[in-house]
């Protein structure tokens, strides 16, 4: 099983539980840090995320992950807020955060570049529509996006 398949399996196990607790599952990472595996789960909801929220979700997921055992080695579970520069992963993210400043990196060059920054206009026919800071409106196919996240507005 690939790392991507493992993450997908974990998401399928935990997303219903996270949703039942009233939160959105934003992202899941399984990474090696300081010679330990870390399963990092990012959650959100409209009112922001506090320590009590993270603890509630962590306790619920701990038990659920023990039952399903999708990770064949020991790991540390961390639950946290996605932060101000949260990733945009799902179609609904590109709709919900329309009007916000974003950064998008693509797998391949589009119009001679792979990095785009600008104001997110929304989603249109499987394309993210972006008003870039320097070259006007661009449409980026969803399947070409390697990484997308909000930009911190000061």
Curated annotation (Swiss-Prot):
GO terms for cellular component: cytosol. The keyword Cytoplasm applies. Keywords: Cytoplasm, Ribosome biogenesis. CDD domains: YlxS_C. Its main location: cytoplasm. The keyword Transmembrane helix does not apply. It is found in: Cytoplasm. One of its GO terms (biological process) is ribosomal small subunit assembly. InterPro entries: Ribosome_maturation_RimP, RimP_C, RimP_C_sf, RimP_N, RimP_N_sf. It holds the Pfam family RimP_N. Belongs to the RimP family. Required for maturation of 30S ribosomal subunits. This is Ribosome maturation factor RimP. It comes from Natranaerobius thermophilus (strain ATCC BAA-1301 / DSM 18059 / JW/NM-WN-LF). The lineage of its organism: Bacteria, Bacillati, Bacillota, Clostridia, Natranaerobiales. The gene is rimP.
């Amino acid at each position: 099983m690939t790392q991507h398949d493992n993450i997908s399996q974990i998401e399928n196990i935990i997303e219903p539980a996270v949703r039942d607790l009233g939160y959105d599952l934003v992202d899941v990472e399984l990474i090696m840090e300081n010679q330990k595996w870390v399963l990092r789960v990012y959650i959100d909801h409209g009112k922001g995320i506090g320590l009590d929220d993270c603890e509630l979700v962590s306790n619920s997921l701990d038990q659920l992950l023990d039952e399903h055992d999708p990770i064949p080695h020991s790991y540390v579970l961390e639950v946290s807020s996605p932060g101000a520069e949260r990733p945009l992963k799902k179609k609904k993210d590109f709709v919900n955060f329309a009007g916000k400043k974003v950064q998008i990196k693509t797998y391949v060059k589009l119009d001679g570049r792979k990095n785009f920054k600008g104001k997110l206009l929304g989603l249109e026919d499987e394309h993210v529509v972006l008003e870039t800071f320097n070259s006007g409106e661009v449409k980026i196919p969803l399947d070409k996006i390697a990484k997308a996240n909000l930009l911190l507005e000061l």
